[in-house]
């Protein structure tokens, strides 16, 4: 199990290092990156590679347990916890964004809606709001949480929150991302399922992208 945890840390560390190297060397992506097919293609390829490595690390483990592929005992409780996590994230963002402007750092906010690029935007929405959350939840609140849980749920929640934040390679947005990752890990620990966090993550990303082109 320790070798698998070391492999997981190595994967997360490499992706984090690449993300920060790209952030400091190349800066933000083009302002209208969400209107380019190449953005979605590169993200989909990256997520495919990540998932392949995650499943390779998880080889030999019971997949249902390792990835928490089970329904929560109560969807009502899971939804209530999800709203609580969402409120915590909103409060953190409202408090920190005026100071750090983390919402602008990722550089995925288009200059406005461009109907001529609707198809490319739809593909990017699929990549960032569906495939991305699935891949990241399986990586962090799935395998990562499972491998860290023997050290205690508090440790697992904290480590998952911090590594999830670093994974994105951002500076100003790092505190909010850590809160987001910690909240999703808390949701995973309380529901014993990956699905509520996956739905919350996907909903959050989709709402952020749609608001970016409509507000």
Where are the language model's segments positioned?
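Alpha-helical transmembrane segments of multipass membrane proteins
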Residues: 14-22, 46-50, 85-93, 168, ...
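Residue-level signature of transmembrane alpha-helical entry/exit and packing/kink sites
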Residues: 4-11, 35-43, 47, 74-82, ...
């Amino acid at each position: 199990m320790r070798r698998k945890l070391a492999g997981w840390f190595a994967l997360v560390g490499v992706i984090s290092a690449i993300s920060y190297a790209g952030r400091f060397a190349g800066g933000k992506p083009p302002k209208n990156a969400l209107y380019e097919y190449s953005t979605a293609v590169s993200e989909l390829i990256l997520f495919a590679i990540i998932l392949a490595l995650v499943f390779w690390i998880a080889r030999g483990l019971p997949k249902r347990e390792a990835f928490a592929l089970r329904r929560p005992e109560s969807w009502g409780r899971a939804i209530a916890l999800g709203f609580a996590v969402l409120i915590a994230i909103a409060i953190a963002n409202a408090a920190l964004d005026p100071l750090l402007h983390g919402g602008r750092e990722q550089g995925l906010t288009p200059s406005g809606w461009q109907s001529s690029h609707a198809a490319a935007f739809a593909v990017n929405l699929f990549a960032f709001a569906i495939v991305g959350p699935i891949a990241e939840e399986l990586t962090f609140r799935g395998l990562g949480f499972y491998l860290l849980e023997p050290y205690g749920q508090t440790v697992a929640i904290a480590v998952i929150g911090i590594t999830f934040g670093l994974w994105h390679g951002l500076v100003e947005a790092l505190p909010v991302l850590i809160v987001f990752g910690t909240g999703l890990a808390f949701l995973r620990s309380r529901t014993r399922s990956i699905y509520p966090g996956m739905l919350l993550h996907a909903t959050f990303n989709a709402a952020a992208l749609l608001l970016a082109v409509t507000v």
